[in-house]
């Protein structure tokens, strides 16, 4: 009794000390170049000059209203109104806004878009070219119309109902249902779960024009709006324009106050299950709710400190559970803890715990309580803290320093929007990144220990089983759960902390040589041939100021050719296992990524039908160790311990007992038709999973990764060439030459259908909502010169716009549709163009016919001058942005070199090639597509 009371006293003191430390106000610095003001009508504005990208700007209007402001007869109309903003305004009737902007390369759905949530509605036009003053004035007029002059014409409203219905259909997935069920649990007793943004079909289908106008007139008003403009302009001149343009907008008389929605009072414990008759699994979900910081606290350093602490605790607890589930005696097959904010209403931490085999649902309560009680009683070790901290830094990308000149318009805009809606800090993004890392670096283990009681003991705890009543699970009663919680509290627990392995990174191999160097035409890249037959494509990264100074892509060109033809499914599962666990010298990848020894040395292993790839990107001071790790992944691999292997096998086999989704079954059949039963698509069954052994892993590793003569290594670095050459000879050229296996003759994994084909399957709809998922495909060949590839890009742009106009806007048949092409590097010149969409079954055949007719009509008449101009404007802008990104990132520059080598096409002359593309080129490409092989795939869910 005395000890227990002492612990409570210590916890109380710790929480008080944490609160006291946080109470010392340390405000975040305000970006002095942001001009923030308020017009007489109450409209807020944010303006800032930024020349990245040069000659462009982002334009936003933010409405501090959303679905919460809807009356019962307006359920879904806040979102519907967002759609209507693109269907006619006072100065831009019908599709005038889209047509006006797309003519200047500002593309709908990409640069022109909007979103609606329960609390806000935000419209934006980004990457807008600042070509002339009159054009800028016209763009501001679009924002002006979105503020108070959306037309909502009856015909446009009726035409849009079909589009909204199809968007509603996309939000009936199992994931959407889980999210809504969780919202209902978190916000029980409040109005929050009563609005889901998309609304009800009854309102969508039947509302009157007056009802949406009533919402519009009441809530779209300047004292609830903000204009945000960031880009390459004179900020003072832009402020004058905004004052002149927006000061005339009036607030309605007798403005209705915006209601402040209150949460139900917190209680200590609640028990409320989540029932879904289409659920395919059982899980215990435990929610820990805490209050969210008030507005005045959100621009303080303490705000970020608390968020980081919460993330670190979650990462540490998840890591512990990952270790525990490896034991065959553990009742759980998987446990994870995440900590998030639910808007600005509350913090919550969520445990999701899945049972192992036939473990009782009640045993999952033991698993949660033991972990929570152990954390409260014993805390974390220093190693656990450092490991979790490292993981959070990586997840939040805090280790990537952001240079001031690299800050983009959208990064500045995001801070302004957050400031207006939530009171967030108006700190310049590069400074914000720096301060966040300073806060993270300053955190000590004691900070975590002090916060644990607040996060657990002082939370409202909600115990909730997610289950399908049809499955016959014996779900515990509230009384049974309470009794088990009490029993767990009396347990004499031991401190079960994670123990981290120490890895030896030393290399004892004879150094090899670079035996030949040659420049690569049309680039700064050099090709180095090594003494073991390996090829290294080295590219200098002059001018890159990022902290990441080295990118290495280690590519072994084996893939499906290295499979044992009699054992493909088992070898594919072995590859999946290695993608997650391949490590070095007795420590697997999961352990490595959690180890402070591997701080700043991430690596990724992946396998495809054409190659095996290991990638890493590090700072200059980590380069030596990164190369060492790469060498050891090839020469001294470690796959995992027996316990991890058995746990993975058992969990995978268990998951295979669950009913397969219709989309999974459909994709399997589609791939057989599209890829002509390519071995890469061999299905992994339970027998293949159970065939996993250390010997099989070693054999697959040797087949896929240890062929130096089939290896291309792409290195891009801002480090001196001499250093990279030294690392290359020590760590790459030293890898053993020779290959003990014979590669099979396997065709490249590319579509290979001929003539006209259909693949149609019908399944029972899991969501009780019927839909058809359609893909219309054409397969054809083009020349591989840059001009021909540009023609494919232009065709994609124009046909996407036509499909959007016909299939989405005129038919109201889908929420999203596009015409997109894939160019297969494995078989040069092969192109597959696809039109993809979801729709209601009764419109399926009509829309499929539309897709075919749109391409046929294009082949008859070709593109218009306006379409050619819009496509070239957009593609030119996109290419310039792509080139800019390559200039500031060694990773992106390296990826582009790898792509160029694989394709044989260097896009440095893309601008020239694009300018030379003619309407005749596009017409020829379209006709090739229309004459090519066809494959129609339809997944019906009814």
Model-derived features with residue positions:
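Bacterial N-terminal signal peptides
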Residues: 10-20
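Extended, domain-scale alpha-helical bundle/helix-rich regions
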Residues: 445-463
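Peptidyl-prolyl cis-trans isomerase
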Residues: 100, 149-152, 156-157, 404, ...
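His/Glu-rich zincin catalytic helix
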Residues: 25-99, 124, 138-141, 213-329, ...
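Bacterial N-terminal signal peptides that target proteins for export
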Residues: 1-11
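M16 family metallopeptidases and their MPP-like homologs
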Residues: 48, 53-70, 77-78, 95-145, ...
């Amino acid at each position: 009794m005395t000890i227990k009371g002492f612990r409570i006293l210590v916890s109380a003191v710790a929480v008080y000390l944490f609160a006291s430390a946080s109470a010392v106000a340390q405000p975040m610095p305000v970006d002095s170049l942001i001009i923030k003001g308020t017009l007489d009508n109450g409209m807020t504005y944010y303006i800032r000059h930024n020349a990245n990208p040069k000659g462009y700007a982002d334009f936003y209007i933010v409405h501090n209203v959303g679905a919460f402001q809807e009356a019962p007869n307006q359920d879904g109309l806040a979102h519907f109104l967002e759609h209507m903003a693109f269907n006619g305004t006072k100065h831009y009737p019908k599709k005038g806004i889209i047509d006006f902007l797309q003519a200047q390369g500002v593309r709908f759905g990409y640069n022109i878009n909007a979103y609606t949530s329960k609390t806000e509605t935000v419209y934006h036009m980004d990457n807008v070219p600042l070509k002339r003053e009159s054009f800028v004035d016209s763009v501001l007029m679009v924002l002006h119309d979105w503020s108070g002059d959306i037309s909502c014409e009856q015909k446009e409203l009726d035409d849009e109902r079909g589009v909204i219905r199809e968007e509603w259909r996309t939000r009936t997935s199992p994931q959407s249902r889980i999210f809504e069920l969780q919202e209902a649990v978190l916000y029980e007793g409040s109005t929050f779960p009563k609005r889901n943004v998309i609304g009800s079909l009854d309102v969508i289908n039947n509302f009157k024009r007056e009802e949406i106008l009533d919402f519009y007139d009441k809530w779209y008003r300047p004292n609830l709006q903000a204009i945000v403009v960031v880009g390459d302009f004179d900020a003072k001149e832009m402020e004058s324009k905004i004052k002149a343009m927006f000061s005339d907008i009036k607030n309605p008389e007798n403005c209705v106050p915006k209601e402040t929605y209150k949460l139900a009072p917190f209680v200590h414990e609640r028990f409320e299950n989540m029932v879904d008759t289409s659920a395919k699994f059982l899980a215990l979900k435990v929610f820990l709710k805490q209050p969210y910081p008030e507005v005045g606290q959100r621009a303080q350093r303490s705000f970020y400190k608390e968020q980081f602490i919460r993330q670190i605790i979650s990462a540490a607890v998840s890591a512990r559970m990952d270790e525990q589930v490896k034991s065959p005696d553990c009742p759980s097959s998987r446990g994870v803890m995440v900590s998030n904010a639910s808007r600005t209403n509350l913090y919550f931490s969520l445990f999701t715990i899945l049972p192992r085999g036939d473990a009782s649902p009640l045993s999952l309560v033991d698993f949660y309580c033991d972990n929570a009680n152990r954390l409260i009683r014993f805390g974390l070790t220093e190693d656990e803290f450092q490991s979790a901290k490292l993981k959070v830094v990586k997840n939040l990308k805090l280790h990537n320093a952001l240079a001031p000149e690299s800050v983009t318009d959208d990064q500045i805009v995001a801070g302004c929007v957050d400031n207006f809606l939530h009171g967030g800090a108006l700190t310049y993004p590069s400074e914000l990144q720096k301060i966040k890392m300073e806060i993270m670096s300053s955190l000590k283990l004691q900070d975590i220990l002090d916060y644990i009681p607040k996060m657990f003991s002082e939370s409202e705890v909600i115990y909730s089983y997610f289950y399908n009543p049809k499955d016959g699970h014996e779900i515990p009663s509230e009384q049974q759960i309470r009794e088990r919680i009490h029993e767990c509290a009396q347990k004499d627990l031991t401190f079960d902390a994670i123990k981290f392995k120490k890895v030896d990174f030393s290399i004892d191999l004879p150094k090899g040589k670079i035996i030949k160097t040659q420049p690569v035409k049309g680039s700064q890249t050099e090709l180095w041939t090594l003494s073991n037959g390996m090829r290294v494509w080295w590219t200098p990264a002059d001018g890159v100021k990022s902290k990441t100074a080295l990118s290495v892509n280690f590519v072994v060109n084996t893939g499906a050719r290295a499979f044992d033809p009699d054992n493909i499914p088992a070898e594919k599962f072995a590859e999946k296992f290695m993608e997650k666990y391949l490590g070095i010298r007795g420590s697997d990848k999961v352990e490595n990524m959690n180890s402070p020894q591997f701080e700043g040395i991430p690596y990724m292993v992946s396998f495809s039908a054409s190659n095996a790839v290991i990638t890493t990107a590090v700072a200059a001071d980590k380069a030596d160790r990164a190369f060492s790790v790469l060498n050891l992944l090839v020469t001294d691999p470690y796959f995992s311990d027996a316990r991890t292997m058995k746990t993975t096998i058992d969990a995978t086999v268990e998951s295979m007992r669950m009913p397969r989704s219709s989309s999974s079954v459909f994709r399997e059949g589609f791939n057989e038709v599209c890829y002509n039963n390519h071995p890469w698509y061999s299905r992994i069954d339970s027998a293949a999973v159970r065939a996993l052994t250390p010997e099989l892993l070693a054999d697959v590793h040797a087949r896929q990764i240890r062929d130096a003569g089939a290896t291309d290594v792409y290195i891009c670095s801002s480090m001196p060439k001499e250093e990279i050459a030294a690392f290359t000879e020590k760590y790459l050229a030293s890898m053993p030459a020779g290959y003990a296996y014979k590669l099979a003759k396997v065709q490249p994994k590319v579509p290979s259908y001929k003539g006209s084909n259909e693949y149609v399957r019908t399944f029972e709809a899991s969501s009780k909502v019927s839909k058809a998922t359609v893909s219309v495909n054409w397969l054809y060949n083009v020349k591989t010169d840059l001009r021909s590839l540009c023609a494919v890009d232009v065709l994609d742009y124009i046909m996407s716009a036509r499909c959007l106009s016909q299939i989405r806007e005129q038919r109201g048949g889908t929420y999203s549709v596009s015409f997109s092409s894939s160019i297969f590097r494995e078989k040069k010149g092969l192109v597959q163009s696809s039109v993809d969409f979801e729709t209601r079954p009764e419109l399926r055949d009509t829309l499929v016919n539309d897709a075919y007719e749109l391409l046929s009509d294009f082949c008859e008449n070709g593109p218009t001058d306006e379409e050619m101009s819009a496509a070239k404007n957009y593609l030119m802008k996109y290419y310039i942005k792509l080139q800019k990104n390559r200039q500031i990132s060694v990773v992106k520059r390296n990826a582009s070199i790898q792509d160029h080598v694989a394709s044989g096409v260097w896009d440095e002359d893309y601008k020239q090639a694009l300018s030379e593309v003619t309407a005749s080129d596009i017409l020829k490409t379209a006709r090739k597509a229309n004459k090519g092989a066809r494959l129609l795939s339809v997944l019906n869910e009814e």
